[in-house]
């Protein structure tokens, strides 16, 4: 669906198993659009994290200059 296509993650952690088990550990006011189990802390603004695991990482949400420096 479109939710998976629009989902993004800046910080994705994967195990070294084959296939890998990956989880997005971004913390924000909402979870990404494809998240099924989103846990939010009752704070203002809320701090939400997705606890789904996949065999892949979603694309990055932000292409910051810092990330570009690391790639070069």
UniProtKB/Swiss-Prot annotation:
Give the highest taxon in the source lineage: Eukaryota
SMART domains assigned to the protein according to its UniProt record, in alphabetical order: BowB
Pfam families associated with the record: Bowman-Birk_leg
- How would you summarize where this protein is expressed among tissues? Seed.
Q: Where is this site: Reactive bond for chymotrypsin?
A: 42-43
Q: List the disulfide bonds.
A: 8-61, 9-24, 12-57, 14-22, 31-38, 35-50, 40-48
Q: Which UniProt keywords apply?
A: Disulfide bond, Protease inhibitor, Serine protease inhibitor
Which one of the record's GO molecular function terms can you name?
serine-type endopeptidase inhibitor activity
* GO CC terms of this entry: extracellular region
Residue(s) at site: Reactive bond for trypsin: 16-17
Say what the protein does: Inhibitor of trypsin and of chymotrypsin. May function as a natural phytochemical defense against predators.
State the similarity comment: Belongs to the Bowman-Birk serine protease inhibitor family.
Query: Could you tell me what this protein is called?
Result: Seed trypsin/chymotrypsin inhibitor IVB
What is the source species? Pisum sativum
């Amino acid at each position: 669906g479109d939710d998976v296509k629009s989902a993004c993650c800046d910080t994705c952690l994967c195990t070294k198993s084959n296939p890998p088990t990956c989880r997005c550990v971004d913390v924000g006011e909402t979870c990404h659009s494809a998240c099924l189990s989103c846990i939010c802390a009752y704070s203002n603004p809320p701090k939400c994290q997705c606890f789904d695991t996949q065999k892949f990482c979603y694309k990055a949400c932000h292409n910051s200059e810092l990330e570009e420096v690391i790639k070069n």
